[in-house]
Amino acid sequence: LQIIKNLKEKYSVYNKKFSLDGKLVGDIGEVLCAEKFGLQLYSDNTTIYDGIQISTGRKVQIKSSFRNYCYFPFGEDKIPDYFLAVNILEDGELEILYNGTGRFLYENYIVLRKLKHYKETYYTLSPGILRQLNALVPIEDIL
């Protein structure tokens, strides 16, 4: 598809495939977050993290959506240092749902609410909950 070719050319520095197998939304979100937050993205299939903030060295996991739920990894060993959850708007802009540490989200919502996981793989988080938590993130923990 031409749109895929265009995305690959425009964002070639990030080396994303923009494939139509369910990763398209994630790839788009990652490159938009990389530009907005000054991230260097890791190659595909890197566990836990999608990239690192160049100016601070903070490692981040990015979850992207088009107004749907976001997923947070299950397991203490999979909690990312920093977690970005974004909605990609129709005009290509990002709505930041959550920008903070993974530990803050985990302790202040998942543990506090005794949230149920899906088959020990992830927790499902609504955009509304993410926005509420985002308002509580300490300023020093924002990318």
Feature annotation, model-predicted:
Residues 1-143:
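Nucleic-acid endonuclease domains
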